[in-house]
Amino acid sequence: MKDIIIVGAGHLGLDVYALIKEINAVKPTWNIKGFLNDFPVDLDQYCIYEKVIGTIQDWIPGKDEHFALAVGSPLGKEKVVNLLKSRGVVFETLISPRAVVAKSAKIGEGSIIISTSSIGTCAKIGKFVVVGNTIVSFNSSVGDFTNTASYVNIYRNVIVGKRVQIWTHSVILNNVDDDAIVGAGSVVVAKVKAGTKVFGNPAKRMPF
């Protein structure tokens, strides 16, 4: 068993915790040492008995420690990655044993593929991406530091940029540029420009 520390103790941290337990149930792989978080969190309320063992800002990695990134904000996790990698942290790519991943698909460093996700033929998942119970269809791509919430469907040949947040039950039929936000339940039929927020069916631009 290898020691692993979960970076972030919010809702995504709980999902990553459950994912590691799911992996261990199939093949014992990880010993969860605890969480890193920059503010106090009571994990007992979630029936999680591992503790917050330090802060992200102050943690110095020890020998043979592995890390799972569970920071929810796309921009925030890029900053965390840059900070911790400068100290020598190595992030693990974690894939649920219940996910369906095509042999020709590519998944980048530090990405998290949760439960019943499906990654299609020739699909490309960048670095530090969260794929949450999402369908990523064939020949589509998802850029670095992007998050998809549960029950998102990314259509074939679609390109999703970097640091994008796509919320639950959205359908992505056209490209989404960097730093955009797609609101819950949206159907994207027209290209989403960089740095914009869209919502609705069909998805339309909304003020921040």
Task: Tell where the protein language model's regions lie, with residue ranges.
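Glycine-rich adenosine-cofactor-binding loop
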Residues: 2-20
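Short active-site oxyanion
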Residues: 3-4, 31-33, 64-67
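Short hydrophobic segments within beta-strands
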Residues: 6-7, 36, 70, 114, ...
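Conserved Rossmann-like nucleotide-cofactor binding loop
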Residues: 12, 41, 204
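Active-site catalytic pocket residues across diverse enzymes, especially alpha/beta-hydrolases
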Residues: 20-24, 84
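NAD(P)-binding Rossmann-fold cofactor-contacting core
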Residues: 23-44
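Phosphate-bearing ligand-interacting subdomains
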Residues: 40-100
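Structural signal for interior beta-strand "rungs" in well-ordered beta-sheet cores
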Residues: 93-206
